[in-house]
């Protein structure tokens, strides 16, 4: 009886090892918040998603106020500065990135002014930093940014799908007696 059980276990193990699970796109989301008052928070949301079939990672960020009535945009007298940092876990990987701020506008690789939202991208050896300045408040959609990046190996010039991908963001928000900066929200993912 024990031999039969051992043979069955060996057959099951062989089946598992010869038919590994298929990999899908890897995605991760992070959220941070800072209280404005007992009923209101400023939130920063970040999502990172790497797609193996495209050798490309995508990121999006959203900033909003959360009130007892739910998420909402910012008041009309708002001034805000958001920083997005895109990087890899490997110092030998640089990011070939583009972004839209606010989301839905044409992709940028340098900087732009869309709807009084000024943005600029700074490239370094192994990361990309996007600075977005908002003049005036509005709905949540105004405070969304998105983009994509191909993590590229310095030595080969080919996409690097082995290292982890990080998308991090924080925002400083100033309006009517409020001047607060959210903690940094970082989403980390891989290609598998």
At which residue positions do the language-model features occur?
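Aromatic sugar-binding surface patches on proteins
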Residues: 58, 124-154
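Enriched for extracellular/lumenal, surface-exposed ectodomains of secreted and cell-surface proteins
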Residues: 114-127, 170-177
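Secretory targeting and sorting signals
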Residues: 1-25
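Internal, hydrophobic beta-strand segments that form the core of beta-sheet-rich folds
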Residues: 146-154, 158-176
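Short beta-strand elements
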Residues: 176-192
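Sequence contexts marking disulfide-bonded cysteines in secreted/extracellular proteins
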Residues: 49-51, 56-58, 167-169, 185-189
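Short structured motifs
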Residues: 45, 151-155, 185
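Short, surface-exposed binding/anchoring microloops in extracellular/periplasmic proteins
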Residues: 28-120, 179
